[in-house]
Amino acid sequence: MEDISVKLYKYMCDEVVGSEKVVNCRRQFFNVLDDVNNDCGDNEWRVISSGSKAEGLDLPGSDFDVMLINEDIHVYELNDILSKYHNLRTRYNLVLNLENAMPGFTLLNIYDVREWDRELIFINEDGIFLSNKSWKRECSRRNDVINGPCLSDALGTVDRAFSLKYVEWPSTSRQWIDRPRFCGWPPESLIHNIVRGRVLLVPIGSKSDSQKDNPLEWRISFSVTEKMLIYSWTHSQIICYALLKLLLKEVIKKNENIDKLFCS
């Protein structure tokens, strides 16, 4: 059995994933690309490469996603925005509404409707909301195709997710920070960097029985956190991760009954 494991590891390194050095070079390339885009680009948007390629993998059919984070719009929990009312850093502020959304999703209440374009908002008896559908339409360019929370170019080579940033670490996830970790992973230094990092909101809602996305919900995304955790893995763990991705694509995704249960 040990001999089979060694042969599989060698095959994955030589033919599928690449060596540890190759994986690190891929990551460094996309990190430099992000730095260039952010130094030379529009200050309104911050760019973070995402997807398998940015994680250092180049599997068959690997995706390349770009998270574009709007720096002018801030999202708060209600208690946070009330306590910081006089020190808000931007005119465009949104408030999380978790109670009326499915787990893992949120509605976004508009804090001051006077600052917002009317085409972006949706009003009903429960309040005033930022619509994910209108947001994607506002961010789209000619010939863009909507692909879940992303906008794809005409060739389908790059998926762009125009996201909003959660200013604080979510209260619903604070238990993750302090829970016991008997194996010492992730280390305290990494947890500290993760909490200081970005939790994003991407424009896609949960699916109803009709398989249509809820146009008012936004998915809470820990993709930046996931990327930081993946960067901390050993190369053996990366190999296992790649095997799971191949299993998902080559086996699970081909079963139409369970395909929609997985998003990546």
What is each stretch, according to the model?
Residues 1-264:
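Non-catalytic helical "accessory" subdomain of NTase-fold nucleotidyltransferases
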